[in-house]
Amino acid sequence: MPIFRNARFEVSIAKSGALPPPEGAEIAFAGRSNAGKSSAINTLADHTRLAFVSKTPGRTQLINFFRLDCGAVLVDLPGYGYAKVPENIRRQWQGLLEHYLRKRENLIGLVLIMDSRHPLTPLDRQMIDWFVPGGRPIHVLLTKCDKLSRNEAAATLASVRREVAALGPQISVQLFSSLKKIGMEEVEHKVAGWLGLPSDDLPAIPTPAQLRAAGK
């Protein structure tokens, strides 16, 4: 069964002092505001409103914890970088994100959401800089890839992979589309590997030929 399906909400917190006890491996999802993080989570969980999708970027101000059937925890971090958010709120988010990414002992990996049309912004790089020193893996989802042509998507994927290779060997990158459900199997297999779970029950990752035949 897909790892993220049947995710159940547990708690939301606004301050690092309110973090719940570390019970189970945590996989964090982070991304710039309006990069498609909430849509990606909802698509992976097969749930229309598990993660709140706001029409106003930057409105998600909490860290939200969701328990998975395998016992691990999906952690939805606040979107970052939206200019209209007041400066004091931005500073609060930055402190909360940095504390969580640097200090949370049961955080085993980060799924970093980037808009495929605008990848590796300075704030994306800041997130990587916070997380890389711990040696834990980062998996980048280049979202909204359905808005690019096939050649543009392939070129973007290759370019981002080249750039992150210099930032740390533990960073992997893939294309993803919530709308077209592109890349779901690849994320599942990646996170299953982090958790040490068998991937036998997960859907197979489509081959390039299968994707072309399906019009993706």
Swiss-Prot record:
GTP binds at residues 31-38, 58-62, 76-79, 143-146, 176-178. SUPFAM superfamilies: P-loop containing nucleoside triphosphate hydrolases. GO terms for molecular function: GTP binding; metal ion binding. It holds the Pfam family MMR_HSR1. It comes from the Bacteria. One of its GO terms (biological process) is division septum assembly. Residues 23-197 form the EngB-type G domain. PROSITE patterns: G_ENGB. The keyword Signal does not apply. GO terms for cellular component: cytosol. Its cofactor is Mg(2+). Necessary for normal cell division and for the maintenance of normal septation. HAMAP family: GTPase_EngB. This is Probable GTP-binding protein EngB. It comes from Aromatoleum aromaticum (strain DSM 19018 / LMG 30748 / EbN1) (Azoarcus sp. (strain EbN1)).
